[in-house]
């Protein structure tokens, strides 16, 4: 699902905002991307539903062909309709009241094999870090989320000192 005319602009935007980084010709998601996806799944599931996006694409095509008024489409999207009362305005109101930033920015990795405590990656204002109990370590910028395993997190947490962990 996606409009070909907006593809390059979307790719540019997600790179600019830090949701992905470029490695060679590949776009690799960052921890910020995982937080954004978690927020969307938990609070805006209807907007990322495949059927909804497909129907919206069809309506956008109708606007492009002059078969539907763009103001009507925007009004219905934002305020909802009589058949479907929850528009974006209501979704945003609920998300503002219900969203827990600490939960959205926390990603479970596993359990520390020695202490039995949970190991989580948190996305904070200064970047991602791994945490277990009272110990945390910054995650190096070059480390992709799929490289964060329980073994790697344990090595980082058990290493002496602070700062970002760097591989040997």
Give the predicted meaning of each segment.
Residues 1-168:
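Basic, low-complexity terminal or inter-domain segments flanking catalytic cores
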